[in-house]
Regions:
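Short, Lys/Arg-enriched N-terminal segments with co-localized hydrophobic residues
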Residues: 1-6
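Short glycine-aspartate micro-motif
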Residues: 8-12, 67, 131-135
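Short glycine-rich, Thr/Ser-proximal phosphate-binding strand/loop in the N-terminal lobe
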Residues: 8-51, 148-166, 170-171
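Glycine-rich phosphate-binding loops at beta-strand->alpha-helix junctions
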Residues: 38, 69-76
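Phosphate/pyrophosphate-binding loops at sites that engage ATP/ADP/AMP, CoA/4′-phosphopantetheine
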Residues: 49-65
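Short glycine-rich phosphate-binding loop at a beta-alpha junction
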Residues: 61-71, 90-92
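Phosphate-binding/catalytic loop of phosphoryl-transfer enzymes
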Residues: 81, 86-92, 98-171
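A mobile "lid/hinge" subdomain adjacent to the ATP/sugar-phosphate binding pocket shared
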Residues: 170-182
C-alpha cells in the first residue's frame, strides 16, 4: 500500500495517448501511457485503470478524487462514466468554469484547450511566472503566461512525427529518418 488515503488519479486524454498518473500529495506514484482508442468501451478503459492499480499495489479506497484533461471529446463521457463507476463520484473535468488561478486573456477563453490550461498551471506551480511552456505531442503547443499569471497567448503546431511524415510524403528527395537518438 501507499502513503495514505489522499491520492488523486489524473488522466490526460490526448490524440495519440492517454496518460494516467496517480499523485499522493506531492509524490507521483506512477505515470503510464495507453493508446487512445475511440473504439474502446467504458468497460475496457475501467479494466485498464484497475490493472494499473493492481500493478502498483494501490487500493481503490485510497483514491479520493480524479481529474480529466482531454483534447478528444468523444472519449470524455466514456472515461468519465468509467471513473464514476470505479470511485462512486464524478471526476473533475478541466474546462470552462474550473478555477485554476490562471487568468485567460483571450477573446473566447472557453476555446482554450484543457491541455494548454493544465500545462500552464503546472508550469506556474513548478517554475513560477512568467513562463513559456512547450508540449511536444501529436501537436506541439506553446503557451505563454506573463508575470501576473495571465495566459496571454500560444501556438499550436504540427508535432515532430506529424511534420516528419508530411515532409517525407510530400517531398521527392527527403528520406525517412528516425526520431530516436542514434
Amino acid at each position: 500500500k501507499r502513503q495514505g488515503k489522499s491520492m488523486i488519479l489524473a488522466i490526460d486524454i490526448g490524440n495519440t495517448n492517454i496518460v494516467i498518473g496517480c499523485i499522493d500529495g506531492e509524490k507521483v506514484c506512477f505515470v503510464e501511457r495507453a493508446s487512445t482508442n475511440l473504439a474502446k468501451t467504458e468497460l475496457e478503459y475501467v479494466v485498464e485503470f484497475r490493472t494499473l492499480f493492481e500493478l502498483y499495489h494501490i487500493g481503490m479506497e485510497d483514491i479520493t478524487g480524479s481529474i480529466i484533461s482531454s483534447v478528444v471529446p468523444p472519449l470524455n463521457n466514456i472515461i468519465k462514466s468509467g471513473l464514476e463507476k470505479m470511485f462512486h463520484q464524478a471526476p473533475m473535468v478541466v474546462g470552462p468554469g474550473v478555477k485554476t488561478g490562471l487568468n485567460i486573456l483571450m477573446d473566447n477563453p472557453a476555446q482554450l484547450g484543457s491541455d494548454l490550461v493544465v500545462n500552464a498551471v503546472a508550469g506556474l506551480h513548478y517554475y513560477g511566472a512568467p513562463i513559456i511552456m512547450i508540449d511536444m505531442g501529436t501537436a506541439t503547443t506553446i503557451s505563454v503566461v506573463d508575470e501576473k499569471k495571465n495566459y496571454i497567448g500560444g501556438m499550436i503546431l504540427p508535432g515532430a512525427k506529424v511534420s516528419l511524415d508530411s515532409l517525407v510524403n510530400r517531398t521527392s528527395q527527403l528520406p525517412r529518418i528516425s526520431l530516436e537518438p542514434p
